[in-house]
């Protein structure tokens, strides 16, 4: 649905094509893959100690959210946690990259971008 504001009208055809087509079970499965990527990625790319600690900690959180049952949290809480995790992944990725741990920063930033895409494409309704 396109907003009625005159400012948004030029991009309405672009925004109108985005659909929220991922179900919550598929969201959880893809979130699990993202968490596993956070656990394995820094080791494969040779990240430093700070990158390893950050990625393993955030990967464990992401896997925990993916494996939580469908009634473990309200949907809005899960969505809010996912958005908060995106912000933390982006901030930690930027911090690691600026401190010299480029491999760790790239892993966190890529998983953060993928998580943001996942959140934006998910239908936030119980099946």
Language-model region placement:
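C-terminal ends of transmembrane helices
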Residues: 15-19, 65-74, 119-124
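Cytoplasmic-side transmembrane-helix entry/capping segments in multi-pass membrane proteins
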Residues: 76-85
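Juxtamembrane loop-transmembrane helix junctions in multi-pass integral membrane proteins
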Residues: 15-25, 46-49, 53, 73-77, ...
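Extracellular/lumenal glycan-associated surfaces
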Residues: 27-47, 61-66, 84-100, 112-122
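Intrinsic N-terminal pre-sequences and regulatory tails
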Residues: 1-29, 125-127
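Hydrophobic, membrane-facing alpha-helical anchors
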Residues: 2-15, 33-37, 56-69
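Structural signature of hydrophobic alpha-helical transmembrane segments
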Residues: 49-61, 105-111
């Amino acid at each position: 649905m396109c907003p009625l504001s005159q400012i948004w009208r030029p991009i309405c055809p672009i925004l109108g094509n985005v659909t929220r087509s991922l179900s919550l079970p598929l969201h959880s499965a893809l979130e699990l893959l993202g968490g596993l990527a956070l656990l394995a990625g820094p080791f494969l790319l040779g990240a430093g100690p700070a990158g390893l600690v950050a990625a393993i900690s955030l990967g464990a959180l992401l896997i925990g959210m993916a494996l939580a049952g469908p009634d473990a949290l309200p949907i809005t809480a899960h969505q809010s946690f996912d958005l908060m995790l995106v912000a933390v992944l982006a901030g930690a990725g930027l911090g690691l990259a600026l401190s010299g741990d480029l491999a760790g920063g790239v892993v966190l930033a890529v998983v953060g971008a993928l998580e943001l895409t996942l959140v934006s494409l998910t239908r936030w309704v119980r099946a």
